[in-house]
Amino acid sequence: MIKKYFDPLRMEKSLYEFWEKNGYFKPQNNKGKPNFCIVMPPPNITGNLHIGHAFQQTIMDILIRYNRMIGKNTFWQVGTDHAGIATQIVVEKKILKEENKTVQQLGKKEFLERIWKWKNTSKNVITSQMRRLGISVDWTHEKFTLDPQISFAVRKVFMTLYDECLIYKRKKLVNWDPVLKTVISDLEVKNRNVIGNMWYIKYYLVKNHSIKISQEYYLVIATTRPETLFGDTAIAVHPNDSRYKKYIGCYALVPIINRIIPIISDEFVDVNKGTGCVKITPAHDFNDYEIAMRHNLSIINVFTRNGKITDVIEEYDISGEKSCIYKQNVPLRFHHLDRFIARKIIVKELIALKLLIKIQKHNLAIPYGERSGSVIEPLLTDQWYLRVEPLAKIAVEAVKSGKIIFIPKKYEKIYYSWMNNIKDWCISRQLLWGHRMPIWYDKKNNIYVGLDEKHIREKYHISDDIFLIQETDVLDTWFSSSLWMFSSLGWPNNKDLFKNFYSTDVVVSGFDIIFFWIARMIMLSMHLIKDHNGNGRVPFKKVYITGLICDEHGKKMSKSKGNVVDPLDMIDGISLDALIQKRIKSTVFSTHSKKIITQIQSLYPNGINSSGVDALRFTCAALSTPTRYIKWNINRLYGYRNFCNKLWNASRFILMNLTHEVEPVKLILIKPMSLSDRWIVAEFHNLVKRYRTALDNYRFDIAANVLYEFVWNKFCDFYIELVKSFINSCSMLELKSTRCTLVYILDSVLRLAHPIIPFITEEIWQKLQVFVKKNDKNTIMLQSFPKYDVKLVNKTILEDMDWIKNIFIIIRSFRMDLKISHTTLISISFKNVSSKIHKLIEEHKDYIKKIAYLDNVSIILSNVDSMLFFKSYIVLGAELLIPYSKIFPKEKELKNLNKEISKIQLAINKLQQRLSNEEFIGKAPIHVVKKYKNQLQIYIEHKTQLCHKKLTMLRD
């Protein structure tokens, strides 16, 4: 027998072990059935899963369970990502904190061993959290992005792209993190708006490329980065700026270093910003770099890779080749100074040289490294790049032609905007952790690319006596992630898995990585994976983009804000003190602690109650609206915990009232079926139609809402309450019909709800199997999914029952208001009845009497005054009347009327007294006087109605 109280934590672990042990998550290999595959975006091994992971994994699991139950061969590939830079930083910090050692002190070999140890621990934590969430992935094919098979696939792809001249090495401007000493992606750069300074500096004009003009002739340059002036190679003005047109083609002198540079024109210059004159420093500003490309300017690097002033400048042309147009070196006094210290000294020298005109406060967007917190430096470095323009065309066409569909469709615009302005992708990183690039050099720096050194020697015919050394850079994590759709399916070795499940059906992702992951997967997959006609195969047919889960105030979650929601806290619950300690511990800035504590105390004064996995999953489904940002709401979680309780209690009632073996699939053949039985079956099939349509259209929020509305309002609060009212007084045939209907609906609801709330549905379904004829599949997840049957949806029954339901609710509320037992018989009448409702009442009079505990139901044909009745209600097609009786006698009602009339008269007297006060009328605002007059009129009208009712009752 089902336990009295719903206790999700008691059953979740054992149920998941039951599923996994029996291999229910594996493809079922149903011959002749279509395949359905999802490859999970691999979580980073940097720490615990957060609510965003739980949200997306719930969505994916709903899709997998739904498609499994409709008979498809489902495969859900799972794995974790090595997350190069993120993992390296986490482990570095851990070692520094625990052992006070740097990576340099530890050594490369030992450090990598520590990361692999971290990986094993972190992966176990992550996969255990996934299991807690109930996700039905095939664990027998779990992957890691640095697994040997994946690494082989990555090397093979790199070699292929290099041999096709799509990968090349070149010196270009990149986002350089001086603390991490590596190039980072745009995704890892965060701009912070700050109030900084704008320095206005004199650049003297020169004549004949060498002679300084008198000090009256100069241009004023406004800059926010005076420390970069050692790298200036031009001054730019707008071609249509009348102030500076005459200087275009002239030359100017860079302060302190005395380099002579040209004055050029470029439409990029904003005439309204600063002075309209811009110093061009191509090696340390991305906009300046683009201007240098257009005007063939020299590019001068003045910073080292740790953000200090170099002792010897590095000069290059626009192709990245070394150049030596300018001879000036950085003055000795600036060598090896940190860039921000150099800034202060340069400003002091400019003041001493009387070259600094003014300093002005200015709003700036400063680029910071998301992981290191350091100011990012645009830096000219040698990196490896992938040419993406040839790949982008076919990827754009795949979406335009409908081979790949974005859901919601609005995200196609974001995809196109990036793809149509795409630039070559920097794929190298200066890290220790990651896929080491399959590149080798000889002593002459000749480049060789292959699967490994042995393969390279064979490929390029290099003898063993020639020394080769491997490139130290690793690949950008996004490179291996972009191959995940096919590499995780065993490509190029595991032919069966790849053959059966590629292309995958849908990828679930956030809008913030459309550029960095989705687009790149499409490009590389379609370039590398071809059909028998040589056409590119899409990696997935649909892209479902979820919103970003934010905190209760709509703010993005981050550890520094102390607002990250741990899904396990929602499942298991956590005390207020433990929650505060947990979130404070994870914050980066201790100055925020007091504010964070106050917020936590306000949001969770009693901590967080245990709600179980199903409540969390239901919340995730219900929150999945097609919006960009989604507010987390703890009250929704508690509401869906109550839903699970409701379903549990309803199931318990049904199971307690079953004594005969029934077979749900034959339910509709059992006669007689009562009106309410036929109504609930019809309502259920309407639910099936709406629910499946919602799932098929990726509207999990709608699916959750219609399921909730049916189970709570129609099945539990109405149908089951009806059954309770007559189950002990009906005939055996009626009882059998009702029991079968209860089982049919419960069994069907459990199967319908299973993709969203798998644990409670499996637990109840297993208990229900004691009373029904079993099939050979011992789990609900392999049962067939309910199908819409139009033959079971009778429109007349739905309309009739909705009308009767309304009458039932009115009478139930009436009983509750007057504290009358639901078993006490009362009488009702109807007047002003339409022909349709007249027919309905006559046809179902006995049924109405039975379910509402009525002594008599009559139809009044004469035009009697409603005032003669105790209560009257206007309903569709009639007026419902409840006559006086021994339960509510006329004398008692007259007494109540007199009390009400006296009460209203007192209110009228008070208002009339106030409105007759001339002093009040003279001083009070017009709208206040008007408000009192309106109140008086309402009271007078109400009193008139009550007096009319009293007189009518006295005359009768």
Curated annotation (Swiss-Prot):
It comes from the Bacteria. One of its GO terms (cellular component) is cytosol. A motif ('HIGH' region) lies at residues 43-53. Residues 889-920 form a coiled coil. ATP binds at K559. InterPro entries: aa-tRNA-synth_I_CS (IPR001412), aa-tRNA-synth_Ia (IPR002300), Anticodon_Ia_Val (IPR033705), M/V/L/I-tRNA-synth_anticd-bd (IPR013155), Rossmann-like_a/b/a_fold (IPR014729), tRNA-bd_arm (IPR010978), tRNAsynth_Ia_anticodon-bd (IPR009080), Val-tRNA_synth_C_sf (IPR037118). Keywords: Aminoacyl-tRNA synthetase, ATP-binding, Coiled coil, Cytoplasm, Ligase, Nucleotide-binding, Protein biosynthesis. The keyword Coiled coil applies. Signal peptide: none annotated. It catalyses: tRNA(Val) + L-valine + ATP = L-valyl-tRNA(Val) + AMP + diphosphate. One of its GO terms (biological process) is valyl-tRNA aminoacylation. It holds the Pfam family tRNA-synt_1. The keyword ATP-binding applies. GO terms for molecular function: aminoacyl-tRNA deacylase activity; ATP binding; valine-tRNA ligase activity. It is found in: Cytoplasm. Monomer. Belongs to the class-I aminoacyl-tRNA synthetase family. ValS type 1 subfamily. This is Valine--tRNA ligase. It comes from Buchnera aphidicola subsp. Baizongia pistaciae (strain Bp). The gene is valS.
